[in-house]
């Protein structure tokens, strides 16, 4: 399936959108083209926010998907064709929607065209750590949609969008209070009732823009985590004899945890070396978003500022005449148009030599 709203199959069954294929439930729920980004075209310069990709992945996972497939996860570069360029244009037959760049396929993806890490690389990485650690528990779980009786309606912001996946005893609660280009309201006095567990003890507010995964009735070593209003991220088993459980405090939500029957309230985040709770077998760490986004990553070598020299070789000629393509939008320049373009010589330091462009 492609991207969509939480519980999209259930929603269609309840009168929204088109009817599902009768055989949909007979196949594993995998995704193939979650929007890791979007490539800008000549006439439509789309900007993708990091939250767009992260929220969609949480929504699909919470809707029952057991495989998160992206288009694209890593940007690329168009190869050269034998007789033409291979970018999509209004003039190509099969893909004549927009004019795309000749060479770059910089998709605003988690990893850029040259491997640079964009902000949603770090947020999606947390989700991938979670699925890697808890995948065997999550995969056989059914998806449940407490708000399934409310068919999706454009502009309806009257209730919290959430689901949970459960095997009857253990569960993960998926929350999405984010929508691209919209500002959803804070959802107040929220309590969940999942697998016979009601939490938190008092109603909480889910701020606008919140995306989170809360655990319910998770057994880890000698710790019974009945619930937590903090996002579960990763279970580290690399240290023989001890288990490290990493969680993230969600901005605007107090972290409340029920551990072995004891309720911890307003738990403050520390760092990845200082646990907020320890038992004989388990250390629990609560991290800020910044720490969680870089959990386990080595400090990166930062780009050092270098002096870039440039000089003008040729002034620009007259402006080109903008033509309208077959889709009634502006066409990108042809090769001949660049004959009148200005030319600059740029010298960029590259290791022990100069890279001339």
Q: What are these model-predicted stretches?
A:
Residues 1-4, 94-106, 170, 175:
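Acidic, His- and aromatic-enriched active-site or binding-groove loops in soluble protein domains
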Residues 2-97, 167:
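Catalytic-core region of carbohydrate-active enzymes that cleave or remodel glycosidic bonds
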Residues 27, 67-69, 103, 169-171, ...:
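Structural beta-strand/beta-sheet cores of well-ordered domains, especially the beta-sheet scaffolds
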Residues 35, 74, 108-110, 165, ...:
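Structured loops at beta-to-helix junctions and adjacent beta-edge loops in soluble globular domains
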Residues 37-43, 107-113, 240-242:
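Glycine- and acidic
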Residues 59-65, 101-107, 202-205:
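Short C-terminal domain-edge/linker segments immediately following a structured domain
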Residues 79-135, 139:
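Aromatic-rich peripheral "rim/lid" segments of glycoside hydrolase catalytic domains that contact
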Residues 116-357:
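Non-catalytic C-terminal accessory domains or segments of carbohydrate-active enzymes
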